[in-house]
Amino acid sequence: MALGNALVEARDRVAWRLNIKVAQQAQKLVYRYATRRLKDDDVVFLNYGYEEDPPMGIPLSESDELNRYSIQLYHSTAAQADVEGKRVLEVGCGHGGGASYLARTFRPATYTGLDLNSDGINFCRRRHNIAGLEFVQGDAQDLPFPDKNFDAVLNVESSHLYPRFDVFLTEVARVLRPGGYFLYTDARPRYDIPEWERALADAPLQMLSQRAINFEVVRGMEKNLDALESVVDRVAPALLRDWIQKYGPARRAYEELRENTTEYRMYCFVKPAE
């Protein structure tokens, strides 16, 4: 029985490695395709969502209320440190909704959103015109910034697609000032968690907090379902829409998080003083 379980685990790990490599190669094409299909559509969030029990109930403007559950994931991640008046970098900013919300609400001195998708960055520049907020095209594994340039680095639901997560962590530490914060949330399948934890432990950063948030993300996805399905309807080719709704990545992620075969976590790290 133990050998059988080990073989199943090995099979799943190999399958995950193959799937993630395909996803990593495809992500630039997929995100560019989505951005171009959406054109001037007002889809500014690409994350699953987050809701606590009892509900968070953070006050939002009427325009932000439409994206409440996606915003709440950003709010909870950023609220792990005081970023008011600080220089903040978000790696993997997507369509800039989180960057816009945090720049307006948490009042950093500057907020820089970086993403690999050049079409997405162009979308962000057109859509989000806020003092102190800028968007830069670049690679998470080769950040185009000087050493010790930021007081906080934020990364939301993005790092699972980086080919070299360890290199990304090294870059985060490089661009952070001593005493700066790495505010981080993402998910991994259970058989990839040991490697995830090793990379985080080996990074030149000190962990301040960690918690599993499967319940909150699943709850957010359930409440955000109409918005997620609406995006699929607008982006996916007509012949594939029903299949994607039933079997696509969002549906698969929901089932894996609900069944705890994937774990979603939220972290806060600090760069030690020199």
UniProtKB/Swiss-Prot annotation:
Q: Where is the signal peptide?
A: none
EC numbers listed for it are: 2.1.1.15
MF terms (GO), sorted A to Z: fatty acid O-methyltransferase activity
Keyword tags: Methyltransferase, Transferase
Q: What is the organism field in this record?
A: Mycolicibacterium smegmatis (strain ATCC 700084 / mc(2)155) (Mycobacterium smegmatis)
Q: What happens when the gene is disrupted?
A: Cells are unable to methylate the glycopeptidolipid fatty acids.
Q: Name one GO biological process term.
A: methylation
As recorded in Swiss-Prot or TrEMBL, the protein's gene is named mtf2
Its lineage reads: Bacteria, Bacillati, Actinomycetota, Actinomycetes, Mycobacteriales
Family to which the UniProt record says this protein belongs? Belongs to the methyltransferase superfamily.
The name under which this protein is listed is: Fatty-acid O-methyltransferase
